[in-house]
């Protein structure tokens, strides 16, 4: 059985790590280089570095910070935010990234996934999907407007489909997240980074229904993101959400747990982890 991965996430704004709730109300969480060093020493399996304002502000990613961060870590580093072209891929890989995460640009130009995969290998291409629940009334389930949507029953009498958002969660697309994940797989993506905007920063647990819906429709590894507030949430997203990796921020940035403590909890629940 493949080992599951614990991945700290560094959301960067103005050169600092920040954390918010539902993609807003950001507050400072520390220095990215220092935090990267700490998580590397604690035994994180990978790191994700996201320049969260780059796409919305239509600017390039902060390259020097990528270089400084890459100098401190000896585990795979995924970098995203403001990646628009295959040249951006090359530049950030040269700066020290092992994988590149694309989100907004891939929606506007899906061929970017294919071209980057062919140039640098599928293992370098991570497609990030920011998704939000779009609730549907039971009497509307047969509506023509839902013909291209994967409607999921998420509670006793609750139904929804999962909508893709871009520009750091600022703009809705009308695109179904399950269909977009399947398209990304067909185009040559190597991994999906799946964030629940509803759960983000709440610390109430991952969106299990969202994660499971994506994981069971594709063969690619799925990294679950958004909502981690306790070790049991990680166990749940592995066990019931069928995620391959769990991304987290607040729980680590504010020293509530170490990576090692989270891994031990999962191993005690018979989840295979790398020590």
Curated annotation (Swiss-Prot):
Keywords, alphabetical: Amino-acid biosynthesis, Cytoplasm, Histidine biosynthesis, Lyase
Domain of life assignment: Archaea
Any one Gene Ontology molecular-function term assigned to this protein's record: lyase activity
The keyword Iron-sulfur appears for this protein: no
Chain's role: IGPS catalyzes the conversion of PRFAR and glutamine to IGP, AICAR and glutamate. The HisF subunit catalyzes the cyclization activity that produces IGP and AICAR from PRFAR using the ammonia provided by the HisH subunit.
GO annotation, cellular component aspect: cytoplasm
Record field: catalytic activity: 5-[(5-phospho-1-deoxy-D-ribulos-1-ylimino)methylamino]-1-(5-phospho-beta-D-ribosyl)imidazole-4-carboxamide + L-glutamine = D-erythro-1-(imidazol-4-yl)glycerol 3-phosphate + 5-amino-1-(5-phospho-beta-D-ribosyl)imidazole-4-carboxamide + L-glutamate + H(+)
GO BP terms, alphabetized: L-histidine biosynthetic process
Gene that encodes it: hisF
Protein name per the record: Imidazole glycerol phosphate synthase subunit HisF
Pathway: Amino-acid biosynthesis; L-histidine biosynthesis; L-histidine from 5-phospho-alpha-D-ribose 1-diphosphate: step 5/9
NCBIfam families, sorted: hisF
Primary location group: cytoplasm
Matches recorded under HAMAP family: HisF (MF_01013)
Active site, UniProt feature: 11, 130
EC number per UniProt: 4.3.2.10
Top enzyme category: lyase
One protein family per Pfam: His_biosynth
């Amino acid at each position: 059985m493949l080992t599951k991965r614990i991945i700290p996430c560094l959301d960067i704004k103005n050169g600092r790590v920040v954390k918010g709730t539902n993609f807003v109300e950001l507050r400072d969480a520390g220095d990215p280089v220092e935090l990267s060093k700490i998580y590397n020493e604690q035994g994180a399996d990978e790191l994700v570095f996201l320049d969260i304002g780059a796409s919305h502000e239509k600017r390039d990613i902060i390259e020097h910070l990528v270089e400084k961060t890459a100098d401190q870590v000896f585990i795979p580093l995924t970098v995203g935010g403001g990646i628009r072209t295959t040249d951006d891929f090359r530049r950030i890989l040269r700066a020290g990234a092992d994988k590149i995460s694309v989100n907004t640009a891939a929606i506007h130009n899906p061929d970017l996934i294919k071209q980057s995969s062919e140039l640098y290998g599928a293992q370098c291409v991570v497609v990030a999907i920011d998704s939000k629940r779009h609730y549907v009334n039971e009497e509307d389930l047969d509506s023509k407007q839902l013909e291209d949507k994967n409607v999921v029953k998420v509670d006793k009498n609750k139904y929804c489909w999962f909508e893709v958002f871009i520009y750091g969660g600022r703009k809705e697309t009308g695109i179904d997240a399950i269909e977009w994940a399947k398209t990304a797989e067909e185009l040559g993506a190597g991994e999906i980074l799946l964030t629940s905007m509803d759960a983000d920063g709440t610390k109430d647990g991952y969106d299990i229904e969202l994660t499971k819906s994506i994981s069971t429709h594709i063969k690619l590894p799925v990294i679950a993101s958004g909502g981690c507030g306790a070790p049991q949430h990680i166990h749940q997203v592995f066990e019931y959400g069928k995620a391959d990796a769990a991304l987290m921020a607040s729980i680590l940035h504010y020293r509530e747990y170490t990576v090692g403590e989270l891994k031990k909890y999962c191993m005690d629940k018979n989840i295979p982890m790398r020590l």
